[in-house]
A protein has these predicted regions:
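SAM-dependent methyltransferase catalytic region
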Residues: 1-172
Length: 172
């Protein structure tokens, strides 16, 4: 007897946060395109044994929240259970402390108000800290496109003790 295999990866398993309206819509469109492409690869690789549910008409496209990731509660925007296996991937904005706009400085203040010298942090440090809070004690990992400055100079003493204090494992 021949068994048919269905793909187990669904768009409903994808979550994200995007600030810009156009980028938010592009993220949703990109998920639909990626699903279509991966379903085709899945079916082609398994020949007559693989199936994927049709994606037309377009329905759910993941859970992409339009909002400011620095101010949202990630566990509400991207719910997680203890049994979940989660990967956070991103390309957050790098903006040095002297090039930040007032709104970005306010974002830093909201996240790091308990730190004396939070104003000297790079903007991207918010994503590192919030992701460490999010993955703490869970089966989760995060990876970001970043600059090496997050691990050099004054950033090290300002940011990393607080991330290490969350007892997360860091891989390089």
């Amino acid at each position: 007897q021949v068994s048919i295999v269905f793909t187990e990866i669904k768009l409903s398993q994808f979550y994200g946060i995007e600030l810009d309206d156009f980028a938010h819509e592009m993220a949703i469109l990109s998920l639909w395109l990626a699903e279509h492409q991966m379903n085709k690869v899945f079916i082609d690789e398994l020949h007559d044994y693989g199936r994927a549910k049709p994606i037309l008409p377009l329905k759910e496209a993941g859970h992409i929240t339009r909002g400011n990731a620095t101010r949202l509660d990630w566990k509400i925007a991207c719910p997680i259970d203890l049994a979940d296996e989660v990967y956070i991937l991103g390309n957050p904005p790098y903006i040095g402390s002297r090039k930040q706009k007032n709104e970005q400085k306010e974002d830093l203040k909201i996240v790091f108000s308990s730190l004396k010298k939070y104003k000297d942090l790079d903007y991207i440090s918010i994503w590192f800290y919030k992701s460490a809070e999010y993955i703490r004690s869970l089966n989760a990992k995060c990876a970001f496109v970043s600059t090496n400055s997050i691990c050099q100079g004054e950033q090290v003493s300002l940011l990393w003790p607080h991330i290490f204090g969350l007892d997360v494992k860091i891989n390089f």
